[in-house]
Curated annotation (Swiss-Prot):
UniProt domain HTH tetR-type: residue ranges: 10-70
Species of the source: Salmonella typhimurium (strain LT2 / SGSC1412 / ATCC 700720)
Protein purpose: Represses the transcription of fabB, involved in unsaturated fatty acid (UFA) biosynthesis. By controlling UFA production, FabR directly influences the physical properties of the membrane bilayer.
Xref: PROSITE patterns: HTH_TETR_2
Biological process according to GO: fatty acid biosynthetic process; negative regulation of fatty acid biosynthetic process
InterPro entries cross-referenced by the UniProt entry: DesT_TetR_C (IPR054129), Homeodomain-like_sf (IPR009057), HTH_TetR (IPR001647), HTH_transcr_repressor_FabR (IPR050692), Tscrpt_reg_HTH_FabR (IPR023764)
GO molecular function, one term: DNA binding
Predominant place of localization: cytoplasm
Residue range(s) of DNA binding per entry: 33-52
Subunit text: Homodimer.
The protein's name in its UniProt record: HTH-type transcriptional repressor FabR
Keywords: Cytoplasm, DNA-binding, Fatty acid biosynthesis, Fatty acid metabolism, Lipid biosynthesis, Lipid metabolism, Repressor, Transcription, Transcription regulation
Compartment annotation: Cytoplasm
Length: 210
């Protein structure tokens, strides 16, 4: 990559980080202005268009980055699990660490999931589907259950985890610890229920084939 391309990428990165830094519990992406983001990034507003077509393209890039960041962290968690440790507890801890370290990235995913922009809703839905698919792949490999079962289990788990994540954004450390324990219990119940359901279906098939 040439010097000019490196500088362009650096400025683009600065714009993304500037936009993330301006999000908060009180401030959504829709309320950000191009001028404010450019000023925070240290460039002239007119220079913004060298990097993004408009503010929406910047927002979609942020959604993609947030989803990718979360998926990469969860992959790392699964690698740690392979070396020993509780699958569910390690995954929950990793997820809560992500929220603690990147609250604005998670806020963006939560808000735009049901926001007014169809493009943003589709982008967040796509990221969540990637997340579900990767978890279903892992469950299929580890639990030796058919795809239909692992997809249903993964979708239920992700729904509960995202709901807990929304709650975790606005509570203190002790409440978050209690939330983690509750979440671990809920996910274990889903996992055991999915396995029990699968075993019962297998027994039905075996019974009918006799």
């Amino acid at each position: 990559m040439g010097v000019r391309a490196q500088q362009k990428e650096k400025t683009r990165r600065s714009l993304v980080e500037a936009a993330f830094s301006q999000l908060s519990a009180e401030r959504s992406f829709a309320s950000l202005s191009l001028r404010e983001v450019a000023r925070e990034a240290g460039i002239a507003p007119t220079s913004f268009y060298r990097h993004f077509r408009d503010v929406d393209e910047l927002g979609l890039t942020m959604v993609d980055e947030s989803g990718l960041m979360l998926r990469q962290l969860m992959r790392q968690a699964r690698q740690r699990i392979a070396k020993g440790g509780s699958v569910i507890r390690t995954s929950v801890s990793t997820f809560m660490e992500f929220i603690g370290n990147n609250p604005n990235a998670f806020r963006l995913l939560l808000r735009e999931r049901s926001g007014t922009s169809a493009a943003f809703r589709a982008a967040v839905a796509r990221e969540i589907q990637h997340f579900i698919a990767e978890l279903a792949d892992y469950l299929e490999l580890e639990n030796h259950m058919p795809r239909a079962f692992t997809e249903a289990q993964a979708e239920a788990m992700v729904t509960i985890v995202f709901s807990a994540g929304a709650e975790a954004l606005d509570i203190g450390a002790e409440q978050r610890r209690q939330l983690e324990e509750r979440l671990v219990l809920q996910l274990r119940m889903i996992a055991k229920g999915a396995y029990y359901w699968y075993r019962r279906e297998q027994e039905k098939i075996a019974h009918h084939s006799e």
